[in-house]
């Protein structure tokens, strides 16, 4: 709406994936040109052979967390023994190992319940699972907005060092049209800078694409996302990626 992409000669169309679709597959098969997604699902897709490549980091810290309801009484990792955890197939189980270890537990002490993306909040609210693996600023705020006080265990508090969300594309696009990639990244950076001071106005554009979203709730989430940018990794340049952080991300 602000014309950042248009000024770079890009006619931008945002197309959220349908239920069951994986962003990385859409990019890797050439059906879409750019994607925004979680780093864990990207690493898994990349290792499977999809020709995708990261071009800009969005979140220098990971936002992943175990989220439970206060009423469930899980107030420490040690209390997670026997819990049912809502889990997506694209998640990497090793991400919660340090948290479990801090409570003298391992993966065999909890039950992973595979769920369809989007169903985890309702399942936790209904008591079908004891906790979910999601975003500290995502499902947690959605549950609280619906009247369910939550307790959040961010995995970064347990020493997990990996990236959060990022922007990626097809390997061929970088080779054949590197200028387009540069212009896309440049426009994205400008839009992120503008959005920082215009959160609600920016979220109105998101709601137009995804009308099921609540403007006030999503604006609150976005403000929390911007807190992730206050990171030493970005002291030199916003969106900067380092080999050490990538190595840590891949090792997980």
Name every feature range the model reports, one short phrase each:
Residues 175-252:
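Secondary-structure end/capping motifs
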Residues 64-74, 163-180, 234:
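A bilobed periplasmic-binding-protein/Venus flytrap-type ligand-binding module shared by bacterial periplasmic
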Residues 39, 94, 137, 167-168, ...:
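A generic alpha-helix surface/boundary motif
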Residues 1-137, 152-153, 160-161:
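Short, glycine-/small- and polar/acidic-enriched structural segments
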Residues 138-139, 158-160, 173-174, 191:
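Short, catalytically relevant binding-site loops at active-site mouths
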Residues 148-150, 211:
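N-terminal secretory/targeting leader peptides
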Residues 155-163, 221-224:
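A glycine-rich, aromatic-flanked flexible loop/lid motif
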